[in-house]
Design a protein with these regions (language model features):
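A short acidic, often aromatic-flanked loop/helix-cap motif at beta-alpha or helix-coil junctions
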Residues: 9-13, 97-100, 156-160
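Glycine-rich, Lys/Arg-enriched anion-binding loops that position phosphate/diphosphate groups
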Residues: 142-241
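Residue-level signal for inorganic ion chemistry
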Residues: 29, 82, 119, 179, ...
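N-terminal catalytic cores of NTP/NDP-binding nucleotidyl/phosphoryl-transfer enzymes
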Residues: 11-74
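N-terminal Rossmann-like or analogous alpha/beta NTP/dinucleotide-binding catalytic cores
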Residues: 61-145
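Short acidic-hydrophobic, aromatic-tinged amphipathic segments that line or gate anion-handling sites
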Residues: 2-9, 91
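Phosphate/ribose-recognition catalytic cores of enzymes acting on nucleotide-derived substrates
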Residues: 196-318
Length: 318
């Protein structure tokens, strides 16, 4: 996959003719995947490259930083997902005021100069200054630019529109299963293990204390989750705590994971943490003994859930 990370690089590139999926794609959720998939099908049928034109920063980060929504994934994960979706050319550039000021016509003319022959777009995406570029404009003006338009309606899952906004709401409410259903994969956070206060070890449940890689991630509702953690290319079941440890005063928000059946040193390692189900909300305990008993119950529940999911996965493969 060819990766282009700036407008200057795009202008200088010599690209083969392509069909381009346009979008912020800030979650690469099932709705986004449908737009990309429709564009991919057209590209393969017409011997074109599959391009995705997207942004490495959310548009609001430069236009109205105070309104920028929490991120659903980092850029490294976004690039990885695009590779898995069969993208040939990924234009993943920062959204700047220069782009915001570009008219819809100028934006489409730029795409045509880059060899774009068809455009895939979701019904709710807009582009160009003032958001004047949209599906309606493309459908009425596409012949002027020599473009084929591949539009997709909003996707619904169990009656709910699949959107980054709804996924953020689900995560904030601790409904990570609903978020996963809309994402098409478990919600995942990447982080690097840093030294903690060692309280988990004293309680019999040593934890990896994560410093998140990237800023402004969507943080799930505080509580304990069953999850999985990727360490050195291997997945381990885990129970994950998100919160500020109310039993111990004056703690900042943190994410800590206790990995089952892992006993080596994790300090400095980069981990991918998937949250599968919220087991309970965060609680304050009157004693360390009561906290320890609850942690044992959390571990039992998490391991039972992970075993059940593993069994379902095995049956699905048969």
């Amino acid at each position: 996959m060819k990766l282009i990370t700036s407008l200057d690089e795009l202008h200088k590139a010599h690209l083969l003719p392509s069909a381009a999926a346009l979008g912020t794609f800030d979650g690469v959720h099932l709705g986004h995947q449908e737009v990309i998939g429709t564009t991919r099908t057209y590209a393969r049928q017409h011997n074109l490259q599959l391009m995705v034109f997207t942004f490495s920063t959310h548009p609001l980060a430069s236009l109205k930083p105070e309104l920028e929504p929490p991120r659903l994934l980092d850029n490294a994960t976004k690039v990885k997902l695009m590779v898995e979706l069969g993208v040939d050319i990924l234009v993943n550039i920062p959204f700047t005021r220069e782009l915001a000021a570009m008219s819809a016509d100028a934006f489409l003319e730029m795409l045509v100069r880059c060899g774009v022959r068809a455009v895939g777009i979701g019904d709710n995406f807009s582009f160009g200054a003032g958001g004047k570029g949209n599906v309606r404009l493309l459908k009425t003006e596409h012949t002027r630019f020599g473009l084929i338009i591949l539009s997709r309606p909003l996707l619904k899952k169990d009656g709910l529109v699949v959107s980054s906004t709804n996924i953020r709401k689900a995560i904030a409410a601790g409904r990570v299963e609903l978020a996963a259903a809309m994402l098409g994969r478990p919600y995942e956070i990447r982080g690097q293990v840093v030294p903690g206060d060692q309280r988990g070890r004293l309680l019999g449940f040593p934890t990896a204390n994560l410093r998140l890689l990237g800023q402004h991630f969507a943080i799930p509702a505080f509580g304990v989750y069953a999850g999985r953690v990727l360490v050195d290319a291997a997945w381990y079941g885990a129970m994950v705590n998100v919160g500020d440890n109310p039993t111990f005063a004056n703690q900042e928000t943190r994410l800590e994971a206790h990995l089952f059946h892992y006993h080596d040193n994790l300090y400095g390692k980069e981990l991918r943490v998937q949250l599968l189900m919220r087991l309970r909300g965060e609680q304050k305990f009157s004693s360390l003994e009561k906290l320890q008993e609850q942690l044992k119950e959390d571990a039992r529940m998490a391991q039972g859930l992970l075993l059940a999911q593993e069994g379902e996965g095995t049956r699905d493969k048969k």
